[in-house]
């Protein structure tokens, strides 16, 4: 998903302290929580470990290795204007980021653009659905009127999930669809 960062300076509902336990369909315990600056290592590992297809679906091109600048941008966020929730999984004593969902808020328009990424080995676990339900709830609590995302037209998993959650699907540009949910 492509994201354009809006320039906002209002609406201060704090999402920076979100934390919730969640269990995947196959019984894995995952902690959903607000991303923090000290998550750079696990965010980089998530991005660097993506399959070509997952990288393309999230970034609209393949990223073989996340740069320090990119990871900093993703982890050092302003919760007045953004929401970023990661899925932390403890695998054999090692903390791993297995997904992230983001919402960039345009308070003036009362809307937000989202992006979602689920690690390949956590796809089809229910995490994408949980992420989107959480983001929708947070958007409503922020008083947003809608959320939307740009999706590659061949990203059938996300398009199917969006339809199941009530998003409308429209055409954006060549090879892309825009999915929108009125809140």
Label every PLM stretch briefly:
Residues 1-183:
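Long, contiguous binding/interaction regions
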């Amino acid at each position: 998903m492509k994201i354009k960062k809006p320039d906002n300076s209002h609406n201060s509902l704090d999402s920076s302290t979100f934390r919730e336990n969640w269990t995947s369909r196959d019984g894995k315990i995952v902690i959903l929580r607000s991303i923090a600056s000290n998550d750079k290592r696990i965010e980089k590992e998530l991005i660097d470990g993506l399959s070509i297809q997952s990288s393309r679906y999230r970034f609209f091109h393949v990223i073989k290795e996340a740069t320090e600048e990119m990871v900093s941008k993703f982890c050092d966020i302003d919760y007045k204007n953004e929401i970023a929730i990661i899925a932390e999984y403890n695998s054999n004593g090692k903390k791993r980021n297995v997904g992230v969902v983001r919402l960039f808020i345009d308070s003036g328009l009362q809307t937000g653009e989202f992006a979602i990424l689920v690690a390949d080995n956590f796809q089809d676990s229910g995490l994408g659905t949980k992420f989107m339900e959480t983001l929708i709830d947070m958007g409503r609590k922020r008083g947003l009127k809608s959320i939307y995302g740009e999706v590659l037209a061949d990203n059938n998993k996300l398009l199917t999930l969006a339809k199941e959650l009530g998003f409308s699907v429209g055409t954006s540009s060549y090879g892309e669809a825009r999915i929108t949910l009125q809140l």
